[in-house]
Amino acid sequence: MKVFKIPEATIMRLSIYSRYLRQLIEEGVETVSSGEIAAGVGVSSAQVRKDLAYFGEFGTRGVGYKVEDLYGCLLKILGLDRRWNIIIIGAGKLGSAFALYQGFLDRGFTISAIMDVDEKIIGSELDGVKIEPLELLQQRVTEKNITVGVITVPAPAAQDVTDLLVASGVKAILNFSPRVLKVPNDVILRNVDLSVNLELLSFYLALNNR
């Protein structure tokens, strides 16, 4: 997996900052301070300045940041100034919910292909995208210039699906299965295990009651 010098937590906060700036643009706000951004997203102003400093100098001391300019810079940093084509493997409840979420398009992500092995649902559509058999994976990745794969299959099938995605040329994978996956060094892998997030909540709840 690729290792980045910039902390992952910083990248996640940049995404939150960009969403907040988008909200300010919609409200007609033209300038904003680091303190106002901090108050809006729930971090310290020092943290905002530190996160932005990884990527250069923004804004004017004593004036703040031009909202639209900073928003545009953050989109570019996050790679959201271009379109990314996605393939979803697994069109069950989780895969279907992912495919139907409208927020991805606004952030630069297009669901370009959906695949499954269940003949009962192959041929049906999710938000205008036809569910196709897994055998077409390589063809669709090439045709549609797909760079991101989303895995929402049962754990036993997850590694096999990962191997197929890697072999087809997909360079980034979002894994919703609980399986620990292996990928080559040039493939970016992110795991999203919902149970882990619930366990994190349970830890803090228990900690507060000790």
UniProtKB/Swiss-Prot annotation:
NAD(+) binds at G90, A91, G92, K93, L94, G95. GO terms for biological process: negative regulation of DNA-templated transcription; response to redox state. InterPro entries: CoA-bd, NAD(P)-bd_dom_sf, Rex_DNA-bd_C_dom, Tscrpt_rep_Rex, WH-like_DNA-bd_sf, WH_DNA-bd_sf. Keywords: Cytoplasm, DNA-binding, NAD, Repressor, Transcription, Transcription regulation. Residues 16-55 bind DNA. GO terms for molecular function: DNA binding; DNA-binding transcription factor activity. Its main location: cytoplasm. The keyword Cytoplasm applies. It is found in: Cytoplasm. GO terms for cellular component: cytoplasm. SMART domains: CoA_binding. SUPFAM superfamilies: NAD(P)-binding Rossmann-fold domains, Winged helix' DNA-binding domain. It comes from the Bacteria. Modulates transcription in response to changes in cellular NADH/NAD(+) redox state. Belongs to the transcriptional regulatory Rex family. Homodimer. This is Redox-sensing transcriptional repressor Rex. It comes from Syntrophomonas wolfei subsp. wolfei (strain DSM 2245B / Goettingen). The lineage of its organism: Bacteria, Bacillati, Bacillota, Clostridia, Eubacteriales.
